[in-house]
Amino acid sequence: MPSQIEPYCQGDLDGLCGLYAIINALCALCPEIDEELATTLFRHLARHMEGRLKEPMPVIAYGISATSLRLLLKRALRFTSKNLGVEIEATEFAMARRNLDLRKLWRHLSNELGSGHVAIIMLRGASHHWTVACSATETTLRLIDSHDRKVLVRSRCTISDTHSRFQLSPSEMISFCAG
């Protein structure tokens, strides 16, 4: 028997990072969300997923699509409003793909984050993972991440198809602020 193994952690093998991204984004905006309320929200969203999906296993194994994430997000925002009386405003990134480059996208995201927002973003390419960006510099995004990633460096990102870098797309970014 090996003397030292690295154990798998919750999230290492499942595709529920989208659920965690929603909860982490809301916790960043609403410090009154404690562990008990976060657990209640997680269960509420998981039950909603189970009820809407005929076969929940593909979501658990392969992850949450952008469409499913948006539906869960609407549910989570109603939950936050009902339970905390806090209205959270969610905004999709409205950027045309034509003439889009990484610097423009990064600048837009940085401006959003600089005005008290957080953003759920999908990282494709080198990974397939929903995460939360909470602040930005010209070269890095600071993350609140269920996989314990702390920063995303712009030099490791692209908007083009890739398998070796992190691909970002404005259609898979949602910005939030407390109203």
Whereabouts are the PLM-identified features?
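Conserved active-site-adjacent core of cysteine acyl-enzyme catalytic domains
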Residues: 50-166
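Active-site nucleophile-adjacent alpha helix/oxyanion-hole segment immediately C-terminal to the catalytic cysteine
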Residues: 1-56
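Low-complexity, Gly/Ser/Thr/Pro-rich intrinsically disordered linker/tail segments
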Residues: 168-179
